[in-house]
Amino acid sequence: MNLHYGLHPATVVALEGDPESRQRIKVRLDWLAATDGGDPPEAWAVIVTPYADADQGFQMLPEVDSTVVVGFLAGHTDHPYVIGSVWNGEADAPERFTDANDKRVIQTRSGSRLEFDDTPGAVAVRISTPGGHEITMDDAGTNIEIAASSGARIELTAAGGVTIEAASTVDVTAAMVTVDAPMSTFNGVVTCDTLIAKGGGVISPMYTPGAGNVW
């Protein structure tokens, strides 16, 4: 029996159908010529991952037809282990390589993306979808921004505290809602269809709608 040590390229053939239900994937060993002159041999390979345990772990499988790197247990080709994937020149990385190496990226086939940006002075974490939705946590601006593809945007910037709590319901439906205040306090029940007070305003411990109904 010929033993094969070291690392070797392989092509992913299938992610399903492991006859032993061991969460292995099928790979084709293109570099290993079949003894009968036929197609290159295929084998079920164990995936090496940073974390694997019962009903938990790090699960990111390579695509069918992608190139992976395999090693063999004690050199036996019938016991391959997939130790990683490679960009083979036909498939590009999601981000261009730079010597500064400021960005770490996880990007899916559709373009959903998690980006860690270590650019000096502009450190940020971004989560985005191919449809244009994005969440940005920006250390440079000390803010958190949620942006929808429609152009809607929520931005949180606070030197103090921002707290929103709801045991049941918080609803805001607007044609226009503007609160710009050194102080706004609401306790108890506030119900109003129309209340317009400018200039002197309304100051009273008791108020009900209607002319003169201020005590």
Residues covered by each model-derived region:
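Right-handed beta-helix
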Residues: 4, 9, 19, 59-66, ...
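Generic structural motif
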Residues: 10-14
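Short aromatic-glycine-enriched beta-strand elements
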Residues: 19-28
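A structural micro-motif recognizing beta-strand termini
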Residues: 28-30, 50, 109-110
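Short, small-residue-rich loop/turn micro-motifs
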Residues: 29-33, 190
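Short, basic/aromatic beta-hairpin or loop at an interaction surface
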Residues: 35-49
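Short alpha-helix capping/helix-loop boundary micro-motifs
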Residues: 51-58
